[in-house]
């Protein structure tokens, strides 16, 4: 049975930590494929800053040289909130012979119990958990730990929120957090001003 990872997010913008997580997941789990799923409107967010077309373009630039990856517009084309279990069910229907994983950050572990339909989701799928800076060892009482595979290496402490703030204040400060092509795209298209 092969492993297919679903990496969902708003990618507003996609940054170096997103790509680092994807590469570490490939290395740790010998994945068949990583599918980046761009959310139209994530359930936990109220606003997007860049148009969906710009977020797709930036993700294509960031993943352009990565093998065994694809970008899915499954959620984006719905034009509404799509819950994680629905996305995983969709990809499970496309890859019924494979094991489906969802990529999350370790900071999301504590929130899992409040995710929509989480018991169903955790019963069918597994999570690839990327360590986030500042998130100490996972509390052993966290629910669903047995459904998690942890990436041992901590990823860079980068957030899309911080990048948007830096671009607005002084775009040169954001350059180290972004793929060079993504950075150039943001500047050339006047995003996050």
UniProtKB/Swiss-Prot annotation:
Metabolic or biological pathway, per its Swiss-Prot or TrEMBL entry: Cofactor biosynthesis; NAD(+) biosynthesis; deamido-NAD(+) from nicotinate D-ribonucleotide: step 1/1
CDD domains in the cross-refs:
NMNAT (cd02165)
UniProt keywords, alphabetically: ATP-binding, NAD, Nucleotide-binding, Nucleotidyltransferase, Pyridine nucleotide biosynthesis, Transferase
Protein origin, superkingdom: Bacteria
Q: Which reaction does it catalyse?
A: nicotinate beta-D-ribonucleotide + ATP + H(+) = deamido-NAD(+) + diphosphate
Q: Which residues form a coiled coil?
A: none
Which is an annotated Pfam family here?
CTP_transf_like
Give the Enzyme Commission number.
2.7.7.18
* MF annotations from Gene Ontology: ATP binding; nicotinate-nucleotide adenylyltransferase activity
Q: Does the keyword Nucleotidyltransferase apply?
A: yes
Q: Which cysteines are joined by disulfide bonds?
A: none
GO biological process terms, alphabetically, are: NAD biosynthetic process
> What family is this?
Belongs to the NadD family.
Summarizing the function annotation, the protein's role is: Catalyzes the reversible adenylation of nicotinate mononucleotide (NaMN) to nicotinic acid adenine dinucleotide (NaAD).
Q: Which NCBIfam families match?
A: cyt_tran_rel, nicotinate (nicotinamide) nucleotide adenylyltransferase
Query: What is the protein named?
Result: Probable nicotinate-nucleotide adenylyltransferase
According to its UniProt entry, this protein's organism is: Endomicrobium trichonymphae
Highest classification ranks of the organism: Bacteria, Pseudomonadati, Elusimicrobiota, Endomicrobiia, Endomicrobiales
């Amino acid at each position: 049975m092969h492993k297919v990872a679903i990496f969902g997010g708003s990618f507003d913008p996609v940054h170096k930590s997103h790509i680092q997580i994807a590469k570490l997941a490939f290395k740790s789990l010998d994945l068949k494929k990583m599918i980046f799923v761009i959310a139209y409107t994530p359930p936990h967010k109220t606003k997007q800053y860049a148009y969906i077309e710009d977020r797709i373009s930036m993700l294509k630039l960031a993943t352009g040289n990565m093998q065994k990856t694809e970008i899915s517009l499954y959620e984006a084309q719905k034009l509404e909130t799509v819950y994680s279990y629905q996305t995983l069910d969709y990809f499970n229907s496309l890859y019924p012979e494979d094991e489906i994983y969802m990529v999350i950050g370790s900071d999301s572990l504590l929130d899992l119990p409040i995710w929509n339909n989480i018991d169903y989701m955790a019963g069918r799928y597994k999570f690839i958990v990327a360590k986030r800076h500042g998130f100490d060892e996972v509390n052993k009482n966290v629910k669903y730990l047995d459904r998690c595979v942890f990436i041992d290496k901590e990823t860079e402490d980068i957030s899309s929120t911080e990048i948007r703030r830096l671009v607005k204040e002084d775009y040169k400060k954001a350059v180290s957090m972004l793929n060079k092509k993504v950075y150039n795209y943001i500047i050339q298209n006047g995003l996050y001003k």
